[in-house]
UniProtKB/Swiss-Prot annotation:
One of its GO terms (molecular function) is cobalt ion binding. Induction: Induced by NrdR. It holds the Pfam family TSCPD. Its EC number is 1.17.4.1. Can grow normally using either of its two RNR systems. The lineage of its organism: Bacteria, Bacillati, Actinomycetota, Actinomycetes, Kitasatosporales. The active site is at N364 (proton acceptor), C366 (cysteine radical intermediate), E368 (proton acceptor). The keyword Oxidoreductase applies. This is Vitamin B12-dependent ribonucleotide reductase. It comes from Streptomyces coelicolor (strain ATCC BAA-471 / A3(2) / M145). The gene is nrdJ. Gene3D superfamilies: 3.20.70.20.
Amino acid sequence: MTETASGPARSSRAKGTKAGKGLRVERVHTTPGVHPYDEVAWERRDVVMTNWRDGSVNFEQRGVEFPEFWSVNAVNIVTSKYFRGAVGTPQREVSLKQLIDRIVKTYRKAGEDNKYFASPADAEIFEHELAYALLHQIFSFNSPVWFNVGTPQPQQVSACFILSVDDSMESILDWYKEEGMIFKGGSGAGLNLSRIRSSKELLSSGGNASGPVSFMRGADASAGTIKSGGATRRAAKMVILDVDHPDIEDFIQTKVKEEEKIRALRDAGFDMDLGGDDITSVQYQNANNSVRVNDTFMKAVQDGGKFGLTSRMTGEVIEEVDAKALFRKMAEAAWACADPGIQYDDTINAWHTCPESGRINGSNPCSEYMHLDNTSCNLASLNLMKFLKDDGKGNQSFDAERFSKVVELVITAMDISICFADFPTQKIGENTRAFRQLGIGYANLGALLMATGHAYDSDGGRALAGAITSLMTGTSYRRSAELAAIVGPYDGYARNAKPHLRVMKQHSDENAKAVRMDDLDTPIWAAATEAWQDVLRLGEKNGFRNSQASVIAPTGTIGLAMSCDTTGLEPDLALVKFKKLVGGGSMQIVNGTVPQALRRLGYQEEQIEAIVAHIAENGNVIDAPGLKPEHYEVFDCAMGERSISAMGHVRMMAAIQPWISGALSKTVNLPESATVEDVEEVYFEAWKMGVKALAIYRDNCKVGQPLSAKTKTVKDTEKAEITEKTEAAIRETVEKVVEYRPVRKRLPKGRPGITTSFTVGGAEGYMTANSYPDDGLGEVFLKMSKQGSTLAGMMDAFSIAVSVGLQYGVPLETYVSKFTNMRFEPAGMTDDPDVRMAQSIVDYIFRRLALDFLPFETRSALGIHSAEERQRHLETGSYEPSDDELDVEGLAQSAPRAQELVAVATPKAEAEAAKPAPQQAHTSAELVEMQLGIQADAPLCFSCGTKMQRAGSCYICEGCGSTSGCS
């Protein structure tokens, strides 16, 4: 992309005066005399985004201008998230051209002002190449660049911040303030609390110190308040404590205790879902927690030895603990509630380029940026699929040369941004300008591996990922050394020259040891080797412009803006996804990477069509016609019957960590059946493999996660019998495919019923629920207040409406799901031991009806349990009765009644098969849930109500692009 005209190195304090000729910029994608915008076809589109749950319009802007090849989803996200100016005013951006120009022209001007370019012509080529890469979704800056650059507001370009706190009240209060200002700007922050005295140490006044866990409470409340004060996403926040801190056990247990509190409150009837009205009363819910462990501790765990907890004031050991027992407590806590994560201190600092300026103590909330305290990092991610050359016949290669040139372009732009960037605090601004940390990374790794026929958990897949990562970071540091020759090394380089060069040698040595696997990765390794040789040579001569170059971020919103199939280093979520259509609507499609992989593996077009059709029908490759079993692993995804194992994720992290300056944002997902020992294995093996940090998430471990939709059976044999009987009944009943109209099934004159008296918040009432003699609930009568009153009349009308609906076949569970959790007065305590708290009379009524008439699995999925079941859960960990307690006959009788239908004359047709009525999914995450019968671990989007999906250690909304992280 660029060539360097050499000149003597000089300090970056010289305010941009050039010592050499600057960068000579080479055209790679663009044509002389033709602007990149003129090479593509543009069209006008309407962006109307709704909350599909209630139909309300969240965002609307019509007539926006985008290239024809941009997907509907990418257009929606960029328009709603990144266009600036009030909608409906002349100041509002209406075209992608305006957005890209706002950014690239700012970067060009700053580059010219700071003497980066050899000539105005080179500056123009830089602008055009940068515009082309953004226009064609080859890479993306992190969200703050899109939000702020070129606008009147502060030019904040960094998404990741690390703060610090000392053992003084002034410093602690400054922490609260600085963190709040960063949250206000939509970014995230992390810090290490280990300098704060433990609760086991004395104050100068003679009393005991509060300890860091106590001060975490105030910071957590602050983060929650700022979120509720108008932000569309949760504040991203990380707190870390060293494993040798005397309060480490309290820190480990903070979220476990709160999770137990959440469960108790939920069982009492409070709304404890993520984002629920009552969850705000629970502490420590706004941060990720991580324990920083060192090699001494991990070796003590390995050997079964003791480990010393040290005073913050004197450094002396004040308590010895069993290392293995403490490690077990960490694993138990993570198993129970997904926190704490783990960071490996000695591994992190062994790769530290600036140890003379301080240790690496903290990280950003997603754990990919790790450097000095009070610093920041601006991120950018490359779309790896844009560099795959595929002739459509199975012949593939990775364009390493073009990839390297784009990396050079992006690193240059990222470094220029530090020249004009604003920062939330003076300390962060000074340190970031002095050390100039960058975080280039990539997205779509999972898609690239599948497209090239590599299993995610395979030696070939890891080799390809490692080669690309090594080339990216090697090229980045080479460009950094070239920039140092023109505009000088970073201010802290002189003090840290020796350790910085040592780390470069470590990267280079790891590159030399890497195993080459096939025709795809071998040329990339060769290019990476050349890059690292240049790094060592130029770095020795010029120094480096940047103290850090690369991280792997979650790439949440920006990944969707680039139309990436996968985020960060994640594997594909599933083989079938949703594609939004221009003009509205959507369709299910099999990933385009699937046929690419099949061609690479040598399958013929007829075979590929059959396999793709099987995937479209079943959502997986199992028993796909003509697909060899040894190729199944290529199509393994994050979820499903053939999901990638936890250690498969860890091995991929270990394969690319040696060539990343920072770390990797990654959560290792475990199935609900995983044990504490499995968590211990992941944490221990990751340390042995050289990973810097990770977190785990065991499915269904948190109350805030939607309940699993997969029902549990009584016994496997009974399941088989029930299935056979059901299929026989269906075959007997469904003989023709006809058009139906529902009819009302009235109750007989004499009908069994239950009358229940109740009080809700002091208001008394009676409910009579009458049933069909053998087939479920048929009508409901409610008696409240005196006859003739408004409330009594409304209850009568409501009862009639519900009863008529039941008699026309509306399932009771539909009413229950709609009317539970409605909030209005009267509300509060009830006299019913099974429903201790009700948010309204309607909430109580339908919880009571669910308990009386719905089968266990149905109401359990809705979070409704009797007092006996809640007690059983406390004792055994399960709401479900044991096998000898089950009344199978009773369950069958209480099953929901099939709707009676009358046929209207239509042509006769034979029934091919009886399938459940299709549910309506709105995102790929929800489609996966339908196919797999389980619900993905994810909250609902605060903006549009869509189910979010994981992106690294964060969540991303596929519908509107909102993210819980910082990219």
